[in-house]
């Protein structure tokens, strides 16, 4: 069976690949949206911390024999703690300044992190095997579904939904959102706003690290792997709407699928289709698809 001259298995394979990439886009843009929406900081270090999550996973297994499933928890925790240190020692001084200062500061953090790991490991890829439980594939009849890629999509959707629910539907999320609008009012309810801000940044970068762990068996691990991802992720955030949690999730997944299908029908445009969509969206709706017009 063919669709527009393309065999169905080939199209479904690219659709799945698009969903996997879209899962990474959604996870990373979600972390960026949390940080920008609640802290008003453009976190350019997100790509480097995504890379660091993958590198820590490789180091944990290579040097200590720590399995993938343990690193799925330990790596985000470690990067989250690093995020707390970054927020307390650097970012806290630029909250009242222009966005450009936050962008430049986090760019500097990116260059330091990438430079250190490039000096130690070089730029060649570090292999990381798929965990035994998720090796192989499942034959669905109409296509062969790689087990690990299916896991990436399911795990990403679960984390994205849990994050959206926490921020939009719980009392904690209400405090977080109110803290960005009127911190003094929130403090009057006994909430430690500076601590809340610190933990928010830590949580946002932990999401990037979680995506890095998921990516380790799929993308060759290298100190520069975040660079190839972060520009596209920023485009996703702009299209979805800066600071929009739901926009980041839906747009990330949607653009991943569009990118995957573009590779089937017009491969030459697959590297630019996301940015073409970004330009068109900004012309029609400058605040993004899910953003609020000011």
Regions found by a protein language model. Name each.
Residues 54-58, 76-82, 107-117, 155-164, ...:
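Hydrophobic core segments of alpha-helical transmembrane domains in multi-pass membrane transport
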Residues 16, 38-85, 89:
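Membrane-embedded helix boundary and interhelical linker motif in transport proteins
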């Amino acid at each position: 069976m063919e669709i527009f001259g393309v065999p169905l298995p080939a199209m479904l394979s690219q659709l799945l690949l698009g969903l996997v990439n879209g899962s990474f886009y959604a996870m990373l843009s979600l972390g960026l949206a949390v940080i920008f929406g609640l802290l008003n900081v453009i976190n350019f270090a997100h790509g480097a911390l995504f890379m660091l999550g993958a590198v820590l996973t490789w180091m944990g297994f290579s040097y200590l024999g720590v399995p993938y499933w343990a690193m799925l928890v330990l790596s985000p925790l470690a990067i989250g703690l690093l995020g707390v240190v970054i927020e307390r020692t650097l970012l806290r001084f630029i909250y009242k300044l222009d966005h450009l200062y936050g962008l430049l500061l986090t760019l500097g953090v990116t260059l330091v992190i990438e430079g250190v790991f490039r000096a130690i490991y070089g730029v060649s890829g570090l292999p990381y095997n798929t965990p035994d439980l998720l090796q192989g594939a499942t034959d669905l009849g109409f296509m062969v579904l790689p087990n690990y890629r299916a896991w990436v999509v399911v795990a990403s959707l679960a984390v994205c939904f849990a994050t959206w629910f926490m921020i939009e539907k719980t009392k904690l999320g209400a405090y977080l959102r109110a803290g960005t609008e009127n911190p003094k009012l929130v403090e009057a309810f006994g909430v430690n706003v500076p601590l809340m801000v610190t933990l928010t940044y830590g949580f946002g970068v932990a999401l990037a690290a979680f995506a890095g762990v998921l990516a380790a068996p799929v993308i060759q691990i290298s100190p520069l792997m975040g660079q190839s991802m972060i520009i596209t992720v920023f485009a996703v955030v702009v299209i979805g709407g800066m600071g929009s949690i739901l926009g980041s999730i839906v747009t990330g997944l949607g653009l991943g699928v569009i990118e995957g299908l573009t590779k089937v029908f017009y491969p030459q445009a697959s590297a630019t289709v996301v940015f073409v969509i970004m330009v068109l969206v900004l012309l029609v709706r400058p605040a993004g698809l899910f953003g609020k017009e000011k």
